[in-house]
C-alpha cells in the first residue's frame, strides 16, 4: 500500500491513495472580496444588526451595494454607521475629500465590526439598562445578550464576514456519470461553481483596474452566490436548476426531516433487522412471535456460522457461510438452538408510544409472513390487512438482557396512559367468551344437578346439556382454594355450563365468576346457592337471566388478576382466555346474514312525523317568527331525534340471539350506530365544508340508497377519509413537540419535601361527570390527611399512597375534595419527585427514581390524538362563536394561543350592575361594580352570557360561554389556577371522545409550560432584565444574592 505513496497521476493530476480521502480532504476558495455570512446577517434576530446596533434593512442596503456607510467620520459632521446614498457620498467627497471614510458591501461591514470594542459596549449597555424603558430596554437586553456571548466565547465579531469559503470533500457532493455520457451532480457543485466563477471574474476585473461600478456589481453577485451556497432562498429568489427547481444549499442539507441530523444521524438504517407482512399467530404464547425461516437464517447468520464452526459442522467461517447459502440440513438444526432464548424486538410504524416496540422470543414458522400474538395488536394498533412490521435483533448480552427484562411483551399489560389493561381480548376472542357465558332459559337439561365439572363436561359432550343451560353443581367439588364460605361450600351452586368452563381458566384461588359485576370480582353472592331441600327448577323459573361477560368485563377481570398476581399469572390467563375465545367462537358458528338485518315497522311513521315538524318550522321561518339559523338548528335537531327514535325502536325489537346484535353487544365488532344505518336510517351527513346538511339520508343500506342519497353519502365518507389522513399527521407532529418540551422531566428523588398540594374534585361539565374523584386520586400521595366526615376516622394520612381500597372508602364516605401531592407543587429541580408523581400507570407500583415520566406523558397525550375529531363545529353561527374541539383544541391549549370563542374574565369581585346591548356595533357592555372600582367589559352581541344583572361574581370567573385564555388567568389569578385550568380543559376534550388519560401526564406538560419566568427587575442579582429563564435558576439566583446579604 505504501508503494504508491505520494505519487500523482501525470494524466489527470490525482494522487494515488485510498479512496477514503475523498470523504476527508477539504478545499477552500480564497475570496477576492469579503462576503457576509447570511446566517449572521439574515437570522432572526440579525446578529450583525445587534452587534452594530443597525437595523437589518440598513445592513442589507450596505451589504448589497445600495448605500454607503460611514466607517470613519473624521473631523466632519457625519457620524459612524450613517448611511449615504450614491449622490450624497459624491457631494460629501467633493466637500470633504479624504477627511472621512465610507464604504460599501461586506468590506465596510467588516471594518465596522472590527471597530466594535466589546468590553466598552457591555459597560455602556448595563448603564443604559438602569434607565431605559419599553422597546429601548428590550433592544438593549438583546444586544447585551449577544455581545456578552461574544466576550465569553472569545470569538471576534468581524469573523461574521468571510474571507475564505471552505469546500466540503468531493464524496459528500458526488458527481455520477449516467448512461449516454451525461452527468448527474449534487446541487452543491453548481452553487460552488457559481461562487468560483464570480470570484475569478472579480479577481480579473480587479487586476484590470475595471471601473468601480462594474467591480461593485461583481462583488454584489459574489455576495449573492455565497448566500445561495450557504442558504439558498433565504434572501430574494432562490437560485434554480433545471425545471425551475430551487437548488439544495448547505443549510438545506442539514435542516428538517430530510436533513443530515434527523434523516441520517438519528434515523440510521441498522443491520440485523428486517421487515415483513404480519399475520395472526393464535398458536403463540404471550411472549412469542413467529419468525419465518428465511428471515431467521439471514438475521441470525453470524450466530449460526459461529455455532456451525463450534460444533465442527464446518471447518471455518467461509465453509459455514457456504452451508447457510445452500440451506443444509445441519443449518436448520443449529438455527433452532441459536434462536432459543434470544429475544427480538418488533416495531410497527408509527411508533406513537413506548408499546410500539416490544420484545418477543422467536418461534420458527413456515411461509414468509411474521406471526404476531393476537393480544398485542391493540398496543401496536396493528391489524392483519397487509400491515408490515420491522424486526431487530439485539446483539450484545446487555441489549438482550434489557429486551428480556424490560421489554418482553408479557410484561406490558397495562397502558402507560391510564393504567388500564391494553392487552385485552378483542373480536373473535370476545365473542367466543360472550357466547360461552350466555345463559338461556329453558334450554335442554335446565335444572340438572351435577357432582363435579367432569360430569358436566361428559353431559355436554353427549348433548344432554347445552353451553347456555342453567344447571346446579356441588360447590364442594370445585377447587378447595376458591374463596367460598363454609356455608356456600355445603350447598348447590346455580350457574351455567359455559360459565363453569370459563371459570376453569381463572387462577385457582380467584372468586367464582357468575355475573359481570364489580362485587363478583371479590366474592360470590349468596343468592346463587340453593337453600337445603329447595327445588332448583322452580328457583330457575323465577330467576332472571344473567347477562354474559362482555369485552369491558373481560378487561376488568384482567386488571383484577394483574393487581393480585402480577405479570406471570396474568399473561398465562390471557393466553388461556385467547384460546378459549377462539375455540368457542369457532364452535358457535356466529355469522352475518341479510336475515339478521330486520325491517322496522314503525319507521315510515317516525319519518312522516319528522317531515311534518320540518314543514312547521319552515312555515314559522317564512312568517319571520324565527331566524334562518334558528330554523337550521331546529331542522337538524328534528332529524337527529328521528334517528334516535328509530335506534330506540330497533333495540326494543332485537332478538338477544341476533348475531349482529351479539357482536355489537359483546364489544367484539361494530356498535349500535352501524346497525341503525343497516336497518334504520343513515341520518344526517356533513357537507365538504364541515356544515351538516339539512337533508338527511332516510334510506338504510338494507333498502338501498337513491342516487341523490348516495351522492350525499360519498360527501361525508370522503370528508371522513381526508380528516383521518390530516389528523394522523397533525397528531404525530403534536407528539413530537410535546416530547421535545418534556423529555428532560425525569423522576430525580424520592421526596422533594413540598408542603403545598393540589385540591382535586370530580371534573364536571354541567351535570355530567367527565372524570370522577376516584380516578383523579387513585395512585397519588395525599398532601393532607382525609377523615370520614361523620365519625372522624382517618381514611388516609399525610404523604400516604391512595390505593384502590382507600380511594373507594374516600368516595363512600362522601368526601368531595382531596388535597394531593402534584407535579405542579413539586420542588424538585429539572424533574419531579416520587411522592409528587405517585404511581407508575404502566406497572401499578410506585414510580422508580430515573423513570422518564416526561416522555411517557408526551406519548400518552399524543398517542390518542388520532382518535380525537378534527372538526371545529360549524353551528351556522347560532351560538355566536364556533367552539374549537378535538385535536385543534388540545393544540390551542398547549401552545397557549388566544382561544377561538374567547370567554371574558373579570378582574374584580363584585356585582353585575348592567348588561347593555349596542345594536349599532353589535356588542354588549357588562358593568361590574367592585368594592373599590367599577369595570366595564365589551363582548360580541352573539355571546351567551353566564351571568345576569344582579349576580355576584368573583375575580377570575368568566362572564360568557367559551374558552378562557390561560394568559389572562395567570394575570388575574395565579400559576396554580392556570395549571389546573389546563388539566381540566385537556381532560374535557379527551374524555368527551371516550379517551382516558391520567391527570399526571397533563400535569407534567402544564408544569413545563409554566417553567420559565421573565426577569422584570434584576434587583441586586446578576440577571438581565427582560431575559427568560428557568424558574429553578431564578430561585437559585435570588437565594444566592440573599445569602451574600443582598
Curated annotation (Swiss-Prot):
Catalytic activity: RNA(n) + a ribonucleoside 5'-triphosphate = RNA(n+1) + diphosphate
Coiled-coil zones: none
Positions with a binding annotation for Zn(2+): 752, 826, 833, 836
Enzyme Commission (EC) number: 2.7.7.6
SMART domains reported in the protein's UniProt record: RPOLA_N
Major enzyme class: transferase
CDD domains to which the protein is assigned, alphabetical: RNAP_beta'_C, RNAP_beta'_N
Presence of the UniProt keyword Nuclease in the record: no
Biological processes per GO annotation: DNA-templated transcription
Pfam annotation, one family: RNA_pol_Rpb1_4
Named cofactor requirement(s): Mg(2+); Zn(2+)
Cofactor, how bound (note): Binds 1 Mg(2+) ion per subunit.
Any one GO molecular-function label of the UniProt entry: DNA binding
Residues that hold Mg(2+) according to the record: 383, 385, 387
SUPFAM superfamilies on file: beta and beta-prime subunits of DNA dependent RNA-polymerase
A cellular-component GO term for this protein: DNA-directed RNA polymerase complex
Keywords: DNA-directed RNA polymerase, Magnesium, Metal-binding, Nucleotidyltransferase, Transcription, Transferase, Zinc
Family: Belongs to the RNA polymerase beta' chain family.
Record text on subunit structure and interactions: The RNAP catalytic core consists of 2 alpha, 1 beta, 1 beta' and 1 omega subunit. When a sigma factor is associated with the core the holoenzyme is formed, which can initiate transcription.
PANTHER family assigned: DNA-DIRECTED RNA POLYMERASE (PTHR19376), DNA-DIRECTED RNA POLYMERASE SUBUNIT BETA (PTHR19376:SF54)
Designated name of the protein: DNA-directed RNA polymerase subunit beta'
Gene coding for it: rpoC
Amino acid at each position: 500500500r505504501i508503494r504508491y505513496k505520494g505519487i500523482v497521476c501525470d494524466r489527470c493530476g490525482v494522487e494515488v491513495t485510498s479512496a477514503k480521502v475523498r470523504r476527508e480532504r477539504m478545499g477552500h476558495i480564497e475570496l477576492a472580496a469579503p462576503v457576509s455570512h447570511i446566517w449572521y446577517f439574515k437570522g432572526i434576530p440579525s446578529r450583525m444588526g445587534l452587534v452594530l446596533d443597525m437595523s437589518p434593512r440598513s445592513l442589507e442596503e450596505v451589504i448589497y451595494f445600495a448605500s454607503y456607510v460611514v466607517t470613519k467620520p473624521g473631523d466632519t459632521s457625519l457620524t459612524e454607521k450613517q448611511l449615504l446614498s450614491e449622490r450624497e457620498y459624491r457631494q460629501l467627497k467633493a466637500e470633504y475629500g479624504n477627511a472621512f471614510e465610507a464604504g460599501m458591501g461586506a468590506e465596510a461591514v467588516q471594518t465596522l465590526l472590527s471597530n466594535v470594542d466589546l468590553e466598552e459596549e457591555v459597560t455602556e449597555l448595563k448603564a443604559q439598562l438602569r434607565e431605559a424603558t419599553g422597546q429601548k430596554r428590550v433592544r438593549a437586553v438583546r444586544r447585551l445578550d449577544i455581545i456578552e456571548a461574544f466576550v465569553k466565547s472569545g470569538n471576534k465579531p468581524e469573523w461574521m464576514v468571510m474571507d475564505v469559503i471552505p469546500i466540503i470533500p468531493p464524496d459528500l457532493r458526488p458527481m455520477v456519470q449516467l448512461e449516454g455520457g451525461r452527468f448527474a451532480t449534487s446541487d452543491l457543485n453548481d452553487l460552488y461553481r457559481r461562487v468560483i466563477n464570480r470570484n475569478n471574474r472579480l479577481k480579473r476585473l480587479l487586476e484590470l483596474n475595471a471601473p468601480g461600478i462594474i467591480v461593485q456589481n461583481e462583488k454584489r453577485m459574489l455576495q449573492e452566490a455565497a448566500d445561495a451556497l450557504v442558504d439558498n432562498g433565504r434572501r430574494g429568489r432562490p437560485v434554480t436548476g433545471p425545471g425551475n427547481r430551487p437548488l439544495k444549499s448547505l443549510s438545506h442539507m442539514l435542516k428538517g426531516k430530510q436533513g443530515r441530523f434527523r434523516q441520517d444521524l438519528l434515523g440510521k438504517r441498522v443491520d440485523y433487522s428486517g421487515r415483513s407482512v404480519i399475520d395472526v399467530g393464535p398458536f403463540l404464547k404471550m411472549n412469542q412471535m413467529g419468525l419465518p425461516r428465511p428471515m431467521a437464517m439471514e438475521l441470525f447468520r453470524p450466530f449460526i456460522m459461529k455455532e456451525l464452526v463450534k460444533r465442527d459442522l464446518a471447518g471455518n467461517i467461509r465453509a459455514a457461510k457456504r452451508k447457510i447459502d445452500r440451506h443444509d440440513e445441519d443449518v436448520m438444526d443449529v438455527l433452532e438452538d441459536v434462536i432459543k432464548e434470544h429475544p427480538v424486538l418488533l416495531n410497527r410504524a408509527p411508533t406513537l408510544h413506548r408499546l410500539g416496540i416490544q420484545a418477543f422470543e422467536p418461534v420458527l414458522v413456515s411461509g414468509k409472513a411474521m406471526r404476531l400474538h393476537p393480544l398485542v395488536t391493540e398496543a401496536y394498533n396493528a391489524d392483519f390487512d397487509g400491515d408490515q412490521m420491522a424486526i431487530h435483533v439485539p446483539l450484545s448480552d446487555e441489549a438482550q438482557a434489557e429486551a428480556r427484562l424490560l421489554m418482553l411483551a408479557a410484561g406490558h399489560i397495562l397502558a402507560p396512559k391510564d393504567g388500564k389493561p391494553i392487552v385485552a381480548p378483542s373480536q373473535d376472542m370476545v365473542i367466543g367468551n360472550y357466547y360461552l357465558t350466555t345463559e338461556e332459559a329453558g334450554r335442554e337439561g335446565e335444572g340438572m344437578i351435577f357432582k363435579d365439572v367432569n360430569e358436566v363436561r361428559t353431559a355436554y359432550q353427549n348433548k344432554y346439556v347445552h353451553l347456555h343451560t342453567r344447571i346446579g353443581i356441588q360447590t364442594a367439588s370445585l377447587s378447595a382454594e376458591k374463596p367460598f364460605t363454609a356455608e356456600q361450600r355445603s350447598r348447590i351452586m346455580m350457574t351455567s355450563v359455559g360459565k363453569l368452563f370459563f371459570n376453569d381458566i381463572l387462577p385457582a384461588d380467584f372468586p367464582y365468576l357468575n355475573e359481570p359485576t364489580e362485587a363478583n370480582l371479590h366474592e360470590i353472592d349468596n343468592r346463587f346457592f340453593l337453600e337445603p331441600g329447595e327445588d332448583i327448577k322452580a328457583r330457575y323459573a323465577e330467576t332472571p337471566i344473567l347477562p354474559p361477560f362482555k369485552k369491558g368485563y373481560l378487561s376488568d377481570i384482567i386488571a383484577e388478576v394483574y393487581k393480585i398476581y402480577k405479570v406471570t399469572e396474568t399473561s398465562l390467563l390471557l393466553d388461556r382466555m385467547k384460546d378459549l375465545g377462539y375455540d368457542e367462537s369457532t364452535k358457535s358458528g356466529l355469522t352475518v346474514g341479510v336475515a339478521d338485518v330486520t325491517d322496522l315497522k314503525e319507521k315510515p311513521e317516525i319519518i312522516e312525523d319528522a317531515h311534518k315538524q320540518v314543514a312547521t318550522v319552515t312555515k314559522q321561518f317564512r312568517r319571520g317568527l324565527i331566524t334562518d339559523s334558528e330554523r337550521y338548528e331546529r331542522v337538524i335537531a328534528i332529524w337527529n331525534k328521528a334517528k334516535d327514535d328509530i335506534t330506540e325502536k330497533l333495540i326494543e325489537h332485537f332478538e338477544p340471539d341476533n348475531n349482529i346484535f351479539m357482536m355489537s353487544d359483546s364489544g367484539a365488532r361494530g356498535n349500535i350506530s352501524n346497525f341503525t344505518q343497516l336497518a334504520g336510517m343513515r341520518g344526517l351527513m356533513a357537507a365538504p365544508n364541515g356544515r351538516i346538511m339539512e337533508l338527511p339520508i332516510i334510506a338504510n343500506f338494507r333498502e338501498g340508497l337513491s342516487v341523490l342519497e348516495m351522492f350525499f353519502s360519498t360527501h361525508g365518507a370522503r370528508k371522513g377519509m381526508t380528516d383521518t389522513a390530516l389528523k394522523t399527521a397533525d397528531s404525530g407532529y403534536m407528539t413530537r413537540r410535546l416530547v421535545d418540551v418534556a423529555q428532560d422531566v425525569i423522576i430525580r428523588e424520592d421526596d422533594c419535601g413540598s408542603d403545598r398540594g393540589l385540591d382535586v374534585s370530580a371534573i364536571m361539565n354541567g351535570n355530567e361527570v367527565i372524570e370522577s374523584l376516584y380516578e383523579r386520586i387513585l395512585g397519588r400521595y395525599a398532601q393532607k390527611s382525609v377523615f370520614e366526615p361523620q365519625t372522624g376516622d382517618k381514611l388516609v394520612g399525610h404523604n400516604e399512597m391512595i390505593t384502590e381500597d382507600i380511594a373507594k372508602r374516600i368516595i363512600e364516605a362522601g368526601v368531595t375534595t382531596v388535597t394531593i401531592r402534584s407535579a405542579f407543587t413539586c420542588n424538585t429541580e429539572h424533574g419531579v419527585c416520587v411522592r409528587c408523581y405517585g404511581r407508575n400507570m404502566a406497572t401499578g407500583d410506585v414510580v422508580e427514581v430515573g423513570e422518564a415520566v416526561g416522555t411517557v406523558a408526551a406519548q400518552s397525550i399524543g398517542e390518542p390524538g388520532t382518535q380525537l375529531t378534527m372538526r371545529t363545529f360549524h353551528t351556522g353561527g347560532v351560538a355566536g362563536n364556533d367552539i374549537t374541539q378535538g385535536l385543534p383544541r388540545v393544540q390551542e391549549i398547549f401552545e397557549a394561543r388566544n382561544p377561538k370563542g374567547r370567554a371574558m374574565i373579570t378582574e374584580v369581585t363584585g356585582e353585575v350592575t348592567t348588561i347593555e346591548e349596542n345594536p349599532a356595533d353589535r356588542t354588549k357592555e357588562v358593568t361590574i361594580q367592585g368594592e373599590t372600582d367599577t369595570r366595564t367589559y365589551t363582548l360580541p352581541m352573539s355571546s351567551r352570557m353566564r351571568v345576569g344583572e344582579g349576580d355576584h361574581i368573583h375575580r377570575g370567573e368568566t362572564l360568557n360561554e367559551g374558552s378562557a385564555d390561560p394568559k389572562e388567568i395567570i394575570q388575574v389569578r395565579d400559576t396554580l389556577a392556570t395549571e389546573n385550568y389546563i388539566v381540566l380543559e385537556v381532560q374535557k376534550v379527551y374524555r368527551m371522545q371516550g379517551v382516558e388519560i391520567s391527570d399526571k401526564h397533563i400535569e407534567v406538560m402544564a408544569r413545563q409550560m409554566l417553567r420559565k419566568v421573565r426577569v422584570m427587575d434584576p434587583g441586586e442579582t446578576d440577571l438581565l432584565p427582560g431575559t427568560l429563564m428557568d424558574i429553578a435558576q431564578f430561585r437559585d439566583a435570588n437565594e444566592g444574592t440573599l445569602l451574600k446579604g443582598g
